[in-house]
Regions:
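Primarily the internal scaffold of c-type cytochrome electron-transfer domains
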Residues: 1-6, 31-41, 45, 49-302
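A cross-kingdom marker for long, charged
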Residues: 289-359
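General secretory precursor processing signal
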Residues: 22-25, 46, 90, 318, ...
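A broadly tuned preference for mixed-charge, low-complexity surface segments
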Residues: 13-25, 87-92, 223-230, 356-359
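Mid-chain, structured segments of secreted extracytoplasmic proteins
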Residues: 2-32
Length: 359
């Protein structure tokens, strides 16, 4: 609940830029206009300030004329790469203070996000029998998600004590990580989920580049534990590489989609790993028993969650109605990735069972 989060943070959610930077359009409000920033997310947040194109948008010839309005505030979400960037700017990185206030964790997958209040059909823009665009949108979402997660990692690595909390005056003299885990670790875990999916993307469309991806990722992972400057450098370098890759992804066909799906469903043991910071518990701990008190609620299951969402996005384009045969396995998988009671072995078994039925 936004009001509760704001109260914990000591801010007004209807006026604070901490909230409105993502929950309101990024444009100045015209004097005397009817719109109020406190109205929250509206059409213009995703499509751009509409003053100079709204009337044209209602005309029959909009599809033929919309390119004329790109310089007048209209944001072209028909370009899948631009759409991914538009969504990722608010749905990947998150301010630690907001997390501490109770904001739910983010898990970015573009195809799933696009189903919420969906009011368009991408296939309408294509020939009648064209292959689904969902695999292409999924792939671009993962590449963009990884790039944004690496930028978050870079920012946190550059901050004082690996925390990037020095931007807040009340944290400036604190060494929070002496008692708490480093925030850069959270960014790394979030990035890992996207990295595993980008590996699957390259398996489908550019298998020869997987070694490049692995080398860059291993460099980031090696630098994070002890070298903030190197972690920032490696993260920035990999983010730049991904920016180039983003522009090289064309329409993904069914064969490539099947390769991506197979890579994911055959990698259960690799994907099931849910890394977390060191945790220990006193034998006389009074921790509330959520399921098993030795398993903290903050398990980050980025890889498993991304795998489940990926199968949902890719399955029907890849194998059609055969997806229905794996319905029960996917339900079991969803149950296994409950953040309050993650079951890695159940996840691995269910993804393998699903994969066997989808080959």
């Amino acid at each position: 609940d936004g009001k509760t989060i704001a109260r914990y943070m000591g801010i007004d959610a209807t006026t604070s830029d901490k909230c409105l930077s993502c929950h309101a359009p990024d444009a100045p409000v015209a004097s005397g206009g009817r719109y109020k920033r406190s109205d929250g997310v509206t059409c213009e947040h995703c499509h751009g300030p509409a003053e100079q194109w709204l009337e044209a948008h209602s005309q029959r010839d909009w599809k033929q004329t919309r390119s004329q309005y790109l310089s007048r505030g209209f944001y072209d979400n028909n370009n899948y790469t631009l759409r991914a960037r538009n969504c990722a700017r608010c749905h990947v990185a998150i301010d630690h203070e907001i997390v501490a206030g109770g904001h739910p964790p983010l898990q970015f997958e573009l195809v799933a996000y696009a189903q919420i209040m969906k009011h368009w059909d991408d296939q309408d823009e294509l020939p009648k029998d064209a292959f689904s665009v969902d695999p292409t949108i999924w792939a671009l979402g993962q590449i963009t998600g990884l790039r944004e997660a690496l930028r978050m990692l870079s920012e946190r690595a550059a901050g004082s004590n690996y925390q990037s909390l020095d931007q807040f005056a009340h944290f400036a003299d604190r060494g929070c990580y002496q008692c708490h885990h480093k925030l850069v670790d959270d960014a790394l875990r979030q990035a890992r989920g996207h990295y595993l999916m980008v590996d699957a993307v390259l398996t489908g469309v550019a298998a020869g580049r997987r070694d490049e991806l692995t080398g860059l990722w291993n460099g980031v992972v090696a630098a994070v534990p002890s070298n903030a400057a190197a972690a920032k450098q490696k993260a920035d370098g990999m983010a730049g590489w991904l920016g180039t890759l983003e522009g090289q992804i064309g329409r993904i066909d069914q064969d490539a989609t099947r390769r991506m799906l197979n890579r994911i469903t055959s990698s259960g043991d690799r994907l099931k790993v849910a890394e977390r910071f060191a945790f220990s518990q006193s034998k006389i701990s009074n921790v509330v028993d959520l399921d098993n008190p030795s398993t903290p609620w903050w398990w980050t299951t980025g890889g498993p969650e991304q795998a489940y969402l990926a199968i949902r996005a890719l399955c029907r384009p890849a194998v059609g109605e055969r997806c229905d045969a794996a319905k029960n396995d996917l339900r079991t998988m969803l149950n296994a990735i409950d953040r309050f009671a993650y079951k890695p072995d159940q996840f691995a078994a269910s993804i393998a069972a699903a994969g066997a039925k989808l080959k």
